[in-house]
């Protein structure tokens, strides 16, 4: 099955300036992500960046770069620019791999592509079970609830679904009803073209979750349980130190 990986790599970061180029055991982080994408069997891998230094690092590692504008409001908008510049056909399967996930398993990159290809839907993603209360109540862990066919009903930073009877007795434990959304997406290129024509939705602004725009406009997102749990992503200096230790 043919698919393309696009890795958005925005240079500016409030908490970690120059994030794509931070060193992880002798390599820039973006090169680690590129290597994981290569292991997935993708037909083509493109790093989408707004900074020449990132482009040089990727090209030095033998990767392909697409220079994009610096003013995109979301990663999906950056993807849309690449889709147009590369003139991908509407049925091309695109997997969006975050540029700050150096420990992402190649298997789940492939999984989200396969998941999309097997369904008549424009967008697919992955989730993993939540087994502890700390994560269930953490607003940085985005929860998702599904219908009987595995399509997303809603994504939220809130604790959904709310286990009324269990939580009436205390908030120390959770049942087996929670899923944490992973920030990896598969799209058909034509869907990306449509997505960027839609105005941002109120729910998207409230939760700060751009995937809610898709549900707002009545489209479906299929969600599969990931075959592997990805390692730590890099958002802060503390995350960076953890990843360096785990990847030694």
UniProtKB/Swiss-Prot annotation:
Q: Which gene encodes it?
A: kdsB
User: Which of UniProt's keywords are assigned here?
Assistant: Cytoplasm, Lipopolysaccharide biosynthesis, Nucleotidyltransferase, Transferase
GO BP terms: CMP-keto-3-deoxy-D-manno-octulosonic acid biosynthetic process; lipopolysaccharide biosynthetic process
Annotated pathway: Nucleotide-sugar biosynthesis; CMP-3-deoxy-D-manno-octulosonate biosynthesis; CMP-3-deoxy-D-manno-octulosonate from 3-deoxy-D-manno-octulosonate and CTP: step 1/1; Bacterial outer membrane biogenesis; lipopolysaccharide biosynthesis
Q: Which organism is it from?
A: Shigella dysenteriae serotype 1 (strain Sd197)
EC number from the UniProt entry:
2.7.7.38
| Described purpose of this protein according to its UniProt entry | Activates KDO (a required 8-carbon sugar) for incorporation into bacterial lipopolysaccharide in Gram-negative bacteria.
UniProt-recorded name of the protein: 3-deoxy-manno-octulosonate cytidylyltransferase
PANTHER family linked: 3-DEOXY-MANNO-OCTULOSONATE CYTIDYLYLTRANSFERASE, 3-DEOXY-MANNO-OCTULOSONATE CYTIDYLYLTRANSFERASE, MITOCHONDRIAL
GO cellular component: a single term: cytosol
Where does the record place it? Answer: Cytoplasm
Could you give a GO molecular-function term held by this entry? 3-deoxy-manno-octulosonate cytidylyltransferase activity
């Amino acid at each position: 099955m043919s698919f393309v990986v696009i890795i958005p790599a925005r240079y500016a970061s409030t908490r970690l300036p120059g994030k794509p180029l931070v060193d992880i055991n002798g390599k820039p982080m973006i090169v680690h992500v590129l290597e994981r994408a290569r292991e997935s069997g993708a037909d083509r891998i493109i790093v989408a960046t707004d900074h020449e230094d990132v482009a040089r690092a990727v090209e030095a590692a033998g990767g392909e770069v697409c220079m994009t504008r610096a003013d995109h409001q979301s990663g999906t908008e950056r993807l849309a620019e690449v889709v147009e510049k590369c003139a991908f056909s509407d049925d091309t399967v695109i997997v969006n791999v975050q540029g700050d996930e150096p420990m992402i398993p190649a298997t789940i990159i492939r999984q989200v592509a396969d998941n999309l290809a097997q369904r008549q839907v424009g967008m697919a993603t992955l989730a993993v079970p939540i087994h502890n209360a700390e994560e269930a109540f953490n607003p940085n862990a985005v929860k998702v609830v599904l219908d009987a066919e595995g399509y997303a009903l809603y994504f939220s930073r809130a604790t959904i679904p709310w286990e009324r009877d269990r939580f009436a007795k205390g908030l120390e434990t959770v049942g087996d009803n929670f899923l944490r959304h992973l920030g990896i997406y598969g799209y058909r290129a034509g869907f990306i073209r449509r997505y960027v024509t839609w105005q941002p939705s109120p729910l998207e602004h409230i939760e700060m979750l751009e995937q809610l725009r898709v549900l707002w406009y009545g489209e479906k997102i299929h969600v599969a349980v990931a075959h592997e749990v990805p390692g730590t992503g890099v958002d802060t200096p503390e995350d960076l130190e953890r990843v360096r230790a785990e990847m030694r």
